[in-house]
Amino acid sequence: MQKNILIIGAGITGCSLAYFLANTGWDVTLLESQDDIASGGSGNPVAAIYPKFMLNDKAYNNFMLKSFMFTTAWIDKLGLNKHDYRFDGAIEILEEAYAHKLEINLSSGSVDQGKILTLIDKSILKKYLMNQDSRGLLFHQGGWVNPIALCRHLVNHSNIKILTNQEIISIEKLNNEWTLKTKDQKVFNSDHVAICNAGYLHQFDLTQHLHTDAFRGQINWVNSTPFQMPSIVICDEGYLAPHMQNKHIFGATYGMNDFNKDIRLSDTKKNIASIKGIHQEFYNYCLVQKIISGRVSWRASTKDRKPYVGRVFNNELFKKMRVRELAQTDQLPWLDNLYVASGFGSRGFTFAPYCTFVLANLINKNLSKEDKESLNYTNPERYRLKKMSLKKAASHIFKV
């Protein structure tokens, strides 16, 4: 039986899903609205990969760690060029009080701290050239990857076809298959469709209720410096990446629903200020540089910071169903063979590989117990069900 799928969006999410499906026998067509793959948020020179925790949310922290551990192990086995990624560690600097609370939170969860992270003090921080009297988390498997190199590697497969400059404006079911139309009236048909276009879910009638906020992020970089720099990713108010591609990259700003595409001097100054606590000498160096390059892109984030990964409802059937019917999860009105993966926020390169691996298992009808637990957690329809006081149904769409 021929298996084919159209994937909208060729950033890290679309490319990862294409990779997993192509390697299980699917013919994949990637439809990208821009001139090339990895042109949006996945097009920065570097992506820092480390978990970002939330206090008092064990479920989120465990899901974050699960994604982080999967992603770093997976990338390490892909066969990327060694100059395109390094997992030598990553440090997040924390205030003393916050670090103590987080340590308690993590120790009471399902985290094997010794293998994954270590809470470190200022004596260790100073070994990494930082001017800190705070504490920090050292993620032993953290690091960075070249996003464009990773995406190109993932789609280098005979089962994957890439079509650029294809802006999809509509999705509808016609004659038992999905029909996609572009802005210039091209038509694509397939039995299966996956929407992986970050913050543009609202473009389509079928997914316009899946709200995300757009966060503008500006990064900056300068040419290699004449003095010693940290050898691993360091995160404080901003982040500083190790030397790569003859540049040092730092950032990033985080502006909600700000759609200015220009590199702004005010944001460059914010990024410089954010690294003062990481490396005083580099901070001083950036203050006097006349040419500091940069890039702007957007991240899509959900209200609860949990991504949308899975299936979506048939809106017409959903509106007709009663609450007691919707409470029966085996009666939920899912659309056949339409999937979404979006809302990863600033943790796209940590979340997306694991989430698309799970989504590929859903598409292949080959779900493990852990996959079902993850899809329960990322259910795209959770808000609509919770709004109807169906909190249990929202997080138990699969029986585990």
Label every model-predicted segment.
Residues M1-I5, N23, I397-F398:
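Extreme N-terminal leader/targeting segments of oxidoreductases
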Residues L6, T13-T24, S33, G41-F53, ...:
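Active-site substrate-recognition segment that forms the wall
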Residues T29:
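Conserved beta-strand positions in the Rossmann-like core of class I SAM-dependent methyltransferases
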Residues V46-Y128:
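Dinucleotide-binding Rossmann-like beta1-alpha1 core, especially the glycine-rich loop
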Residues L55, N81-E92, T118-H157, T253-D258, ...:
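Helix-loop-beta segment of a Rossmann-like dinucleotide-binding subdomain
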Residues N56-S67, E95-A99, L137-H153, D262-D267, ...:
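Short beta-strand to alpha-helix junction loop
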Residues L137-D184, F188, H192, C196-N197:
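Helical element adjacent to the flavin cofactor pocket in flavoenzyme catalytic cores
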Residues C286-V400:
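C-terminal catalytic lobe of FAD-dependent flavoproteins
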